[in-house]
Every structure is written in C-alpha cells, then in structure tokens.
Amino acid sequence: PALIDLIRAGRRVERHHPWPRVSVDGGTWRSAAGALADGSLSLLGLWGEPSRVHMALLDNSTSNIGVISLDCPDRRYPSVAARHRPALRPERTIHDLFGLVATATPDSRPWLDHGRWQMQAPLGQRLDAAPDPAPYPFLPAEGDSLHQIAVGPVHAGIIEPGHFRFTASGETDR
C-alpha cells in the first residue's frame, strides 16, 4: 500500500506536526512492514513509548512523510524486522528501554542492556533486573577469506578507551 492508504486506514492523532500521524491496528502495521519490504516505503524511524510503538515512513513515489502508531496493551506488537531487516536494531532498543516485545522477530537478543542494568525496561514498567542474565551471544564473522584484527586497548581522544576487533576480507594486513 501507499503511505496515503495507511494514513486513511488509521485514526488521526490531532495536533501532530509537521507530518500526519495516525493510530493503526495490527493489520495496517503489518501492511506497512510489507511496503517497506517491497521498497515502496522507506523507514525514517521506529521508536517506542511505554505502551505504543511508532514508525515514521517516507513514500518513495510521492516523497510524502507520515507517522503510524500502534497501541500495545499486551506489551507486544508485530515485528517490522521480520519483513524489513533495517528495523531490527530499533526493535531491540524498544524492547530494552520499554519492555515491548516484537513478535516473530528474527533476533531477540538485547541491544543496549547486556545484563548490567539494575532494572529491565527503565523507560517502561521498570521491572527488577533479571537475577541471572543470559550470556550475550555476539555473532562471529565467519569465512575462509576473513581475518580478525584485534586493536586495543586504545583511546580515541574524546571517547572512552575501548578494545575493538575488525574483520578484513581477502587480504593480509601486516
């Protein structure tokens, strides 16, 4: 569907500027994810509140912009990333900050909270921290021509020190 079709399917939210915003149902939310997947819309933003999620969308054929919002009374919403992978990190962020769960997401690992926070969902229901946080499985870079380069500890000036691992493909760095 075009962005105008999604806007017409929703309930207009008054006093939202400069772009129109509507509250939609789960079916319309899923239709927007499908339009992202087929390239007719572009994702400008995906963010949450304690009980709802929002998507800012660009219609690629008209350059119109609009925002759709979905209430999450059961703290769940249909995953956008299941159809459009660039939505994956914002979905994981929404879960970490607000405790809202994207159903059928392809990756449910935490994005911000790796088990070190004193609580879960600090901007949502503020639940106690998990007693035994699960280990965070970082995804490895794998392949015959890949080389891992460890750098650090380093200090980059205005940011804190860190230890980084870069992956190079196809050539040896000496």
What kind of feature is each model-predicted range?
Residues 1-173:
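Terminal low-complexity/charged segments
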